[in-house]
Amino acid sequence: MRRKGLRLTPNRAEGTARTWSKYYDKLADHFLTRIRVKPSTVILEAGCGKGQLTIPMIQKLPKSVKLIAVDSSIGPYLGWLDELESKIHRSGLESRVHLLRSDVRRIKGVKDSSADIVVSNELLCDLPRKDQLAKALNEFYRILRPGGSMIHGEWSSSPVDHGVGFKVKHSPAWNPDQLFNYTKRAGFHNFRVSYFTETVDFGYNTAIAELRTWGVTESFFKHYERSLKRYGVQLPYEHVIQCEK
């Protein structure tokens, strides 16, 4: 049975940028309905990238809410923090969003118990080793105030519909069961899991363009060309974990 959820399909007229904007706008809604935000809330976004989630999230919150956006902006993400800075200036959000270039395993310049909420999306998959994950979770715990919460989203390892079309099968470093154990070790409690059921379907041309931005090799295109032409690409859902300090 097909699971219910919005399916966004980019077309040549609007391009993938518009589709991704819709996707992250709805993902921000999913996150914000699951966290308690007060007028004085301080949010730290770990691994903010180029602000795909940062911008729609802060725009939906009261103007008194502050957000610290943290990213190392190195390797495949080089320059992304600079791109986010430009977006913040264009959106007039300079007074509400503070950018911090730092490794999330040791966040410099953020005091103990200074944030109410830690948010991240597609971050923990970039920390595939146990020691890397433990350092990041311990750092999030350090930064959060007592009673504060952490929420993290990541693509599920399961495609939306089995047996129909060509799917992206994501292999996350950590599934919800594993994250339950590691967050508990870090001191977190009240662990919960939800699912963000929106997805994106890419036709052949938009799929090729999108996959190139992910650094997909030419050998991949050659091997899967027939499937891509016939089915395009469909992204998996996200599992969203949250817990409290």
Predicted regions and their residues:
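Class I SAM-dependent methyltransferase Rossmann-like catalytic core
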Residues: 2-26
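Conserved alpha-helix/loop element of class I SAM-dependent methyltransferases that forms part
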Residues: 22-39, 56
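Class I SAM-dependent methyltransferase SAM/SAH-binding core
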Residues: 59-106
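A short acidic, Gly/Pro-enriched loop at the edge of an enzyme's catalytic core
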Residues: 105-118
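A short SAM/SAH-binding and catalytic strip from SAM-dependent methyltransferases
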Residues: 117-131
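A short glycine-rich, Lys/Arg-flanked "PGG" loop and its adjoining helix->strand segment in the class I
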Residues: 134-146
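Conserved class I S-adenosyl-L-methionine
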Residues: 151-173
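Conserved Class I S-adenosyl-L-methionine
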Residues: 193-244
